[in-house]
């Protein structure tokens, strides 16, 4: 996600992304990521997938945005909000 976000900003070539439907470019980027992981699955199918698939279920993959500082800035996420993760707890790989 971090690499995709950096690539997105490189594609803007230093220009600001236009606001569309009152959403900034960064907000649209993160919303698109979340929508990509939307899913609806029955409990039995989820249990079977957890037992056989090496990948985490979609609801856990979508929450990786909590580790990206830009997500907090894009949505003005505050410390008292449910998805807030303190900066010293955010995972940084690159």
Predicted regions and their residues:
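Zinc-dependent metallohydrolase catalytic domains
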Residues: 1-94
């Amino acid at each position: 996600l971090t690499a995709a976000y950096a690539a997105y900003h490189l594609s803007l070539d230093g220009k600001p992304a236009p606001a569309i439907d009152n959403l900034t470019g960064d907000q649209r980027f993160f919303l698109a990521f979340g929508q990509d992981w939307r899913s609806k699955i029955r409990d039995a199918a989820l249990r079977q997938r957890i037992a056989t698939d090496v990948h985490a279920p979609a609801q856990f993959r979508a929450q990786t945005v909590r580790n990206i500082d830009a997500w907090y800035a894009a949505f003005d996420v505050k410390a008292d909000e449910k998805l807030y993760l303190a900066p010293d707890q955010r995972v940084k790989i690159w």
